[in-house]
């Protein structure tokens, strides 16, 4: 059995003015080496849960642990091991592919030879090598998706949160992403993929 890397105990979140909780008390353990699906209709709380796991939103009750770190109390430690790709891929459309990668590398303090090797690996992995000078805003939906994934992987996370990564992209691009993500899981990464 794989090592458990995310554990949730009674995790809840409510928003003011809402009759029902955004996330009802949730208990689960998620293991590395798998792609775990977080499936539900729009408004079910998938993005809210992802944001709590990424330390971007504080839970109202219960607790979460990601690789032993509390997402709020240990945000610096969590940032070093977690990659989060939001629904819109988190890209700067007025920057080129390479400028987006450089920005994310700067944010993750990836420098020098490690940066060069990481970029070479990610550009090959995503097949974006020929497009490094293209503005992100001029990429197709599938290419934006791949760039978003590459930017998320710059820091070599152990946990990858993908919030609705297949929305707005063609079936071939979704299949390619699915294959890339399964390869990462096969290498021991924990992947949580939300979808409707």
PLM regions with names:
Residues 6, 13-196:
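ABC transporter nucleotide-binding domains
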Residues 1-4:
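Primarily ABC-family ATPase nucleotide-binding module
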């Amino acid at each position: 059995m794989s090592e458990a890397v995310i554990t949730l105990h009674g995790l809840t979140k409510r928003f003011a003015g809402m009759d029902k909780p955004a996330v009802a008390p949730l208990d689960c353990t998620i293991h590395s080496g798998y792609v775990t699906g977080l499936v539900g209709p729009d408004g079910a709380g998938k993005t809210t849960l992802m944001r709590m796991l990424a330390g971007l939103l504080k839970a109202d009750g219960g607790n979460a642990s990601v690789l032993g770190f509390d997402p709020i109390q240990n945000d610096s430690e969590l940032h070093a091991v977690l990659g989060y790709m939001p629904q819109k891929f988190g890209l700067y459309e007025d920057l080129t592919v390479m400028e987006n990668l450089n920005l994310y590398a700067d944010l993750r303090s990836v420098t020098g030879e490690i940066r060069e090797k990481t970029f070479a690996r990610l550009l090959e992995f995503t097949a974006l090598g020929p497009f490094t000078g293209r503005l992100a805003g001029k990429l197709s939906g599938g290419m934006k998706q791949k760039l978003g994934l590459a930017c998320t992987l710059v820091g070599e996370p152990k946990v990858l949160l993908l919030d609705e990564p297949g929305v707005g992209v063609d079936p071939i691009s979704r299949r390619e992403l699915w294959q890339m993500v399964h390869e990462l899981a096969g290498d021991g990464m924990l992947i949580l993929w939300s979808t409707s």
